[in-house]
Curated annotation (Swiss-Prot):
Designated gene of the protein: DLD
Reactions mediated catalytically: N(6)-[(R)-dihydrolipoyl]-L-lysyl-[protein] + NAD(+) = N(6)-[(R)-lipoyl]-L-lysyl-[protein] + NADH + H(+)
Family classification: Belongs to the class-I pyridine nucleotide-disulfide oxidoreductase family.
Site entry (Important for interaction with PDHX and activity of pyruvate dehydrogenase complex), positions: D448, Y473
Subunit structure: Homodimer. Part of the multimeric pyruvate dehydrogenase complex that contains multiple copies of pyruvate dehydrogenase (subunits PDHA (PDHA1 or PDHA2) and PDHB, E1), dihydrolipoamide acetyltransferase (DLAT, E2) and lipoamide dehydrogenase (DLD, E3). These subunits are bound to an inner core composed of about 48 DLAT and 12 PDHX molecules (by non covalent bonds). The 2-oxoglutarate dehydrogenase complex is composed of OGDH (2-oxoglutarate dehydrogenase; E1), DLST (dihydrolipoamide succinyltransferase; E2), DLD (dihydrolipoamide dehydrogenase; E3) and the assembly factor KGD4.
Major location (coarse): mitochondrion
Function: Lipoamide dehydrogenase is a component of the glycine cleavage system as well as an E3 component of three alpha-ketoacid dehydrogenase complexes (pyruvate-, alpha-ketoglutarate-, and branched-chain amino acid-dehydrogenase complex). The 2-oxoglutarate dehydrogenase complex is mainly active in the mitochondrion. A fraction of the 2-oxoglutarate dehydrogenase complex also localizes in the nucleus and is required for lysine succinylation of histones: associates with KAT2A on chromatin and provides succinyl-CoA to histone succinyltransferase KAT2A.
Name of the protein described by the UniProt record: Dihydrolipoyl dehydrogenase, mitochondrial
Transmembrane segments: none
Length: 509
């Protein structure tokens, strides 16, 4: 695909844009007009500037397309950058430092501190500073790549037309050859519970609390629930997560990893009520919240009182008022836009990627789809293997996985073998005094091919990318076991687990 990109870019720069086969035949290129009171003409118009949208816009421009990106919010970056992935990682990182300094960890390392105080306002400032810098980075990349940014709510008003309406009611019309919907997702509301982003909050409000709650109840122990719950638990809150399912970590996590993960979080002070459903929440006159819960299968009701209630039951595609109904584009039962393997809707020049289509709601999945989609518009190959898309939970320790879990392999009737290696036997983990967790590798019994990798431990989110590469290239467990890994590193645990899977046992355990 890289070679195609270079050829296409070269041809575009030489003025051969309209002479090559790229799916836009018969339509001449018209120079962009960026005056606010005049229409804009474009080759590609992207609706949404989240990870999928902004990456797609930049890639389209790099391929020679005249590109417009419409964003309804005042800032670029979508949920991920503004109120999701990025600010949450800032708080996870800084709360971890505070937890180490405030607890016994530093003292055990010979670092004695006389007084440790939390300045929550300063911590929030650092988070906001990182977000602001990255938003500015996207704006710079748009300018550098000549992507036209239009502020307003984008609605498809014709097969080749998008209208962006600003908050003041003014609008701008974009005439376009191709339209790419990348509008992302929004928080799924909980029936009967109204979010005010003050004491009853979504993930957005949980990233900007003014003080550490004495007691926090989290509805949902999936990825977002355990991440944000961990932040406030480290900073001093008494945190209880109520989960309808019987495990923590959400959909896709390996059950053995989940059980060990839950044990470690409980050791840190995180409390869980599994197989439990929330039936309602009532605000009291003193400002506290009574959360009513009962067993998922039904049973005796119980009330948990808290200062802040965090609702984390997932996200849903954002497709409202995009003009899809008028175009005859129907949604599937889960509210997603149906697309083919080239991300085309039933109208061939209208595409959709990211959270609005099927697949995991992950920023990096949307980014991949964005790049691949616009390469397809330019006539290139379209390939994505969703089995090779990694998932990460950014707690401490981290959890990461890619490929199949044991449960999935059993369900599919695939014979497999398992290789495991604990971080307690890893030299670098020992020197770091950070040994919780393990690496678990699943290989095909007959071929030794890597089928899945599941990591619980320090640096799991980085290590899983080696596993994703192995899966993408069809590597065997022996292939990885025979790659020399630097010593001492945490990634040696990944090699050792593959040794165990391929040869029956590791070296250092």
């Amino acid at each position: 695909m890289q070679s195609w990109s270079r050829v296409y870019c070269s041809l575009a720069k030489r003025g051969h844009f309209n002479r090559i086969s790229h799916g836009l035949q018969g339509v001449s290129s018209v120079p962009l007009r960026t005056y606010a009171d005049q229409p804009i003409d474009a080759d590609v118009t992207v609706i949404g500037s989240g990870p999928g949208g902004y990456v797609a816009a930049i890639k389209a421009a790099q391929l020679g397309f005249k590109t417009v990106c419409i964003e309804k919010n005042d800032t670029l970056g979508g949920t991920c950058l503004n109120v999701g992935c990025i600010p949450s990682k800032a708080l996870l990182n800084n709360s971890h430092y505070y937890h180490l300094a405030h607890g016994r960890d530093f003292a055990s390392r010979g670092i004695e501190l006389s007084e440790v105080r939390l300045n929550l306002e300063k911590m929030m400032e650092q988070k906001s500073s990182a977000v602001k810098a990255l938003i500015g980075g996207i704006a710079h990349l748009f300018k550098q790549n000549k992507v036209v940014h239009v502020n307003g709510f984008g609605k498809i008003t014709g097969k080749n037309q998008v209208t962006a309406t600003k908050a003041d009611g003014s609008s701008q019309v974009i005439g376009t050859k191709n339209i790419l919907i990348a509008t992302g997702s929004e928080v799924t509301p909980f029936p009967g519970i109204t979010i005010d982003e003050d004491t009853i909050v979504s993930s957005t409000g949980a990233l900007s609390l003014k003080k550490v709650p004495e007691k926090l109840v989290v509805i949902g122990a999936g990825v977002i629930g355990v991440e944000l719950g961990s932040v406030w638990q480290r900073l001093g809150a008494d945190v209880t997560a109520v989960e309808f399912l019987g495990h923590v970590g959400g959909i896709g996590i390996d059950m053995e990893i989940s059980k060990n993960f839950q044990r470690i979080l409980q050791k840190q002070g995180f409390k869980f009520k599994l197989n439990t459903k929330v039936t309602g929440a009532t605000k009291r006159s003193d400002g506290k919240i009574d959360v009513s819960v009962e067993a998922a299968s039904g049973g005796k009701a119980e009330v948990i009182t808290c200062d802040v209630l965090l609702v984390c039951i997932g996200r849903r595609p954002f497709t409202q008022n995009l003009g899809l109904e008028e175009l005859g584009i129907e949604l599937d039962p889960r509210g997603r836009i149906p697309v083919n393997t080239r991300f085309q809707t039933k109208i061939p020049n209208i595409y959709a990627i990211g959270d609005v289509v099927a697949g995991p709601m992950l920023a990096h999945k949307a980014e991949d789809e964005g790049i691949i989609c616009v390469e397809g518009m330019a006539g290139g190959a379209v390939h994505i293997d969703y089995n090779c898309v990694p998932s990460v939970i950014y707690t401490h320790p981290e959890v990461a996985w890619v490929g199949k879990s044991e449960e999935q392999l059993k369900e599919e009737g695939i014979e497999y073998k398992v290789g495991k290696f604990p971080f307690a036997a890893n030299s670098r983990a020992k020197t770091n005094a950070d040994t919780d967790g393990m690496v678990k590798i699943l290989g095909q019994k007959s071929t030794d091919r890597v089928l899945g990798a599941h990591i619980l431990g320090p640096g799991a989110g980085e290590m899983v990318n080696e596993a994703a590469l192995a899966l993408e290239y069809g590597a065997s467990c022996e292939d990885i076991a025979r790659v020399c890994h630097a010593h001492p590193t945490l990634s040696e645990a990944f090699r050792e687990a593959n040794l165990a899977a391929s040869f029956g046992k590791p070296i250092n355990f």
